[in-house]
Amino acid sequence: MGMTSDTIADLLTRIRNALKAEHLYVDLEHSKMREAIVRILKQHGFLAHYLVKEENRKRTMRIFLQYSNDRRPVIRQLKRVSKPSRRVYVPAAKIPYVFGNMGISVLSTSQGVLDGATARAKNIGGELLCLVW
């Protein structure tokens, strides 16, 4: 796959499409940023788990999707906020509460990629990467 200019949007789209198709997992190229986002989604129960594989010096990720008991995707929506063409930065006080606090925001901060609640607790803002609920 050729690298898109927005690897985060690509990550979200691939997860979205895999869920629509009821796939168990999705494979994609690894990056530190992608893994950081996926780790947060897993922590919050939005993804089952993930693996990072290395083959001929190329790293890939396999992301295992999470479905509820009635086989519905746990993730209802993945929304990219900040984009390469239009970056969105928020101070700690403006970090959004997502979907009545059932969802999460993901930020890139001076202390790494964090979910909104953690960034808010540390009183640091950052680039608002995406919302998930």
From Swiss-Prot:
One CC-aspect GO term: ribonucleoprotein complex
NCBIfam families: PRK00136.1
Entry's family note: Belongs to the universal ribosomal protein uS8 family.
Keyword Ribonucleoprotein carried by entry: yes
GO MF: rRNA binding; structural constituent of ribosome
A Pfam family annotated for this UniProt entry: Ribosomal_S8
Keywords annotated in UniProt: Ribonucleoprotein, Ribosomal protein, RNA-binding, rRNA-binding
Function: One of the primary rRNA binding proteins, it binds directly to 16S rRNA central domain where it helps coordinate assembly of the platform of the 30S subunit.
InterPro entries with a match to the protein in the record: Ribosomal_uS8 (IPR000630), Ribosomal_uS8_CS (IPR047863), Ribosomal_uS8_sf (IPR035987)
Organism for this UniProt entry: Chlamydia caviae (strain ATCC VR-813 / DSM 19441 / 03DC25 / GPIC)
Name of the gene: rpsH
The protein's assembly and partners: Part of the 30S ribosomal subunit. Contacts proteins S5 and S12.
Protein name: Small ribosomal subunit protein uS8
